[in-house]
Regions:
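Membrane-embedded hairpin module used as a gating/binding unit in multi-pass transport
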Residues: 170-174
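Small-residue-enriched alpha-helical segments and adjacent helix-cap loops
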Residues: 6-143, 154, 158, 162-165, ...
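A structural-propensity feature for long, helix-poor, extended segments
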Residues: 147-149
């Protein structure tokens, strides 16, 4: 996206996580291809600023080769915030994996449409900007909830992917 100081490249780390090596790579790429300035967005993304149009293909290749950007476009476009401290074997992590795996089947969504996955006992993302929240309710059931709604739809891990797709199709048709 073009900004006043050149292109702006938005990086959406998969599972809202970066390794220290990836963070160092982003800093290096920001200096190499951009103006050295980065921003952190409200949706847990990083933005590298000041890129020249001619440097964009090299930057994208470097991001993909280092595992920071996904070579699979639908997965890379997914706006997903995963609660901090979510462990890789947890329900929240598996729900995030299900969303990444289903990304090709998603209907056309607005560019800022996003998910917040907050399945722990503490709500870390209650104020995070998103359209669909995935949570565990007080009885321990998996819940899909439209942002701003008190009530949600109870689902299971087995039905999660199909229930999310149904919710997304409802969203775009309404």
């Amino acid at each position: 996206m073009m900004s006043g100081d050149g292109l702006l490249v938005r990086i959406k780390p998969a599972f809202s996580r970066l390794t220290s090596r990836q963070a160092q790579m982003i800093a290096l790429l920001s200096k190499r291809h951009g103006n050295g300035f980065m921003d952190i967005t409200n949706r847990a993304n990083l933005q590298i600023r000041g890129l020249k149009q001619s440097d964009y293909p090299l930057m994208l290749k470097d991001l993909q080769d280092s595992g920071i950007a996904d070579k699979h476009e639908a997965r890379d476009r997914l706006n997903l915030i995963l609660a901090p401290f979510t462990e890789s074997q947890s329900v929240g992590w598996r729900c995030a994996e299900a969303l990444y795996n289903a990304a090709d089947a998603f209907p056309a969504l607005p560019s800022k449409f996003g998910f917040a996955i907050d399945c722990g006992t503490t709500r870390y993302l209650q104020h995070a900007s998103c359209d669909i929240r995935v949570e565990i309710d007080e009885t321990g059931q998996l819940l899909i909830r439209l942002d701003g709604c008190e009530q949600g739809y109870v689902t299971s891990e087995e039905k999660f992917q199909s229930d999310i797709l149904q919710a997304l199709h409802w969203f775009v048709s309404s």
